[in-house]
Amino acid sequence: MLILVLSFQLNAKKITNKVLVYSTAENLTKEEVAVLGISKDVTLIEINKSKFKVNGDRVYIAPGRHTFQVKKPLSITYDGELSATLEAGKYYVLDTWTEPAGGRYYRVIYKVFEVSEGDFENYNRKVLNMLIILSKN
């Protein structure tokens, strides 16, 4: 199920963590948080204006509406911002890809997908492509 999409521009200082528990989720149990997986092609640099730097890992986050500032590392000219409502006990993946936009131009698209726990644990580009096809039907 497609949750939401894009917009642009920001720089951030580097903060790293393997598994990041977003501050508003620190006192919540596993069943009370949403799990956001960050694909290897995306760097999450901000959640609700709080600076982070997470790439290819997962974030345990309090449920609710969140705004993310993200960046595709290999594409310096495109930064993105998106928002999504995350629910407790559910799994999401933040991913990106490009589409032709005419001539030499292309558009960078960021999306948050809800996935099953199994798909989350085995997440890869093949799973994303299947989700994109399903979201268009």
Residue spans for each PLM region:
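Bacterial N-terminal signal peptides
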Residues: 1-7
